[in-house]
Amino acid sequence: RNVALVGHGGSGKTTLLEAALLSTGVISRLGRVEDGNTVSDYDKMEIEKGYSISASVVPVEYKKMKINFIDTPGYFDFVGDVNSALRACESAVILVDAFSGIQVGTEKAWNSCKEYNIPTFFLINKIDKENVDVDKVVTDLQHKFGTSVVMLSEPIEGDVRESLTEAVAESDEELLEKYFGGEEFTDE
């Protein structure tokens, strides 16, 4: 599986990848973009500038599954690398800084994912910052990108389950008929 990490510059794509590498035991110490010691930003210019300039493929094994994460630049001066990465991926994760919310890079990443018809997930990052309102970010994402945006990080029950079911139903005509007919969805 190839998964692109896309989003506005500074949204935390490289840091998320570092956390995945640490969690899976690939690295023993979390690298920091600011310190110039991350796995995916190894180019001299990237280390000097403190941000990704070109896409990097980093394989991660998790539960006997290999995932090739493609860490892409967030600044759209490097959009060619982003588009190349998306063409090689089965899915994409758009990172959104919880404090900053939707930014130009978020919108451009979404548009590129839609252009290549790639299943896309939003990951709201940096939720530990002070004065962050995750519900507002989710609402903003829904207003900007449509009702198919639902929060999955909460237990899938109650209102969240209903929102998820409704969003899935809206994505397919056959599922929509099942939904309005009161039928339960299968796991497929």
Name these PLM-found stretches.
Residues 1-11, 29-30, 98-188:
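P-loop NTPase catalytic nucleotide-binding module
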